[in-house]
Amino acid sequence: MKLFHILAFSGLLLFSANDSFAQKRTYECNPINPEYQAMADNVVKFAMEDPDAAEKAYTKLTKKIGKSTDDLLSVGTYFLEQNYIQGAMMYSKMLYEKAPEDINVLMYCGEVRMKMQDWGNAGQMFDAVLSYDPNNVEALKRNAFVYKNVNPHVAIDALQKIKELDPTYFKADKDLGDIHYKLDKYKDAVGYYENYYKAVPKDTINLDIRSCENFLQSLYSQANFDRMLEVSKEVLPLAPKDMVLLRMDFFAKVNKMGEALDYDGAVKAATDAAAYIYNNEFADSLYLYLDYEYAAVLEKEKGNIPAAISFYEKALAKDSSKLSGYKELSALYARNKQAALGIKTFNTYLEKLGDKADLSDRFLLATKYMAAYQQEDTPEAEKAEYYQKAGEIFREVIEKKPDYVQAYIFLARLSNVDSSKPLVEVRDLYKKVLEVSEPNKEKFENYRFEACRYIFFYDVSIEPADIEDAKKICEIAKSIRPDDDFVKNAETYLKQMAQ
């Protein structure tokens, strides 16, 4: 047998460094015989240096032990605790053949396979223990760990049983929270994490920071921003450079700005929390689309449109599939008097939207062209193109949906190229606004009032003035805003004309 020669090529196969589950002894085992310990130390020593010597030392030790189950278990445990996984595995096979119903042997065999990350066989060993002793808490704990990534429902059952047997074992709630988090059952995860968080001491030794990350992200999914802030305030001092904790604290503070009594203070708190983004405290690859989107939202709230644009550009560079980002960026470009970029970005949004684009999207595109046309620094040649494009799309929308009130109002505004004189085309469009908005007067009352103002101006400006229509329009306007100066002035004018 040249097993040592084969495995010596890879230290990872000889010595385990798997600390995914902090292993402590979960079974009864006699102290190792000092003579056997010295011989075992030789096996471990030679394993990486001299495979032939290691094999001889191993054979000598095993012969010396003979058939004693207790000594095989104590030496195997010594190998396991020295992270000499090959020796531990070989002893586990011998022990399982000798005593397949011994709970201590089964627990040992399960521990060895856990070290090897052989989760399936580890689970079988712990299942065997539970078939003999259903209330074996240590086997239940190991089973929960083994199965939580491969068969979470088995793990959940084990953890619930542990809670029944040992209500003080708060780690069961942590594990239940982790499992439900991975199953995207965030509401359930929050409940378990709350139980864990209330019970665990808040220090770096006892508190599991990764589970706190999951706890905060579960709270975020439930929009529980108040609780997020409470938790992050306690946990961040324990892990001040944890990116997930910083992220969740920042997101919560941005979401709380709108309802803060001290708005300026809330904005400052959010700005301070965004330092991990502003100061590039982490490698760029670690930032998410949402990091930059939230930073953009914050800068937009502060009125810093160029900075908001920059962050949205970074966000979309991270994830170009986020369609809402293109839509928002397009609007920001327009606000920043970069109408051409706004149009280009919105067209990208429409291309990515594909068949899901609807008339409202086409309408918004027309408003982008209209904004570009109205932008003062747009070259005249481009103005003409933008004017034509906007008009074409507004008319296209109206043709497909004749009761699209907003399309009429915007086309009327676009067509009002000379505000000093009445234009019949504009009057007709505003008449359509009143007509198509009739079924929803309250919803469109601002548009209706705007239409009344123009139509009244038209009626009294033409020769001869259309006083009868002007009276009707004045009454409509009065029904919307009876105390408005326009209504009062219109009534005064009509009275004078009647004299």
PLM regions: where:
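Short coil turns that delineate tetratricopeptide repeat
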Residues: G66-K67, P100, P134, P167, ...
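Canonical positions in the second alpha-helix
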Residues: K60-L61, M94-L95, A128-V129, K161-I162, ...
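N-terminal leader/linker segments that initiate helical-solenoid repeat arrays
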Residues: K2-F9, S20-K93, E97-N104, Q124-D127, ...
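Canonical tetratricopeptide repeat
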Residues: S74-Y78, Y108-E111, R142-F145, D175, ...
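TPR alpha-solenoid repeat register
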Residues: D71, V105, A139, A172, ...
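Register position in tetratricopeptide repeats
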Residues: M48, E81-Q82, K115-M116, F145-V150, ...
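Residue-level recognition of tetratricopeptide repeat
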Residues: V43-V44, T77, E111, F145, ...
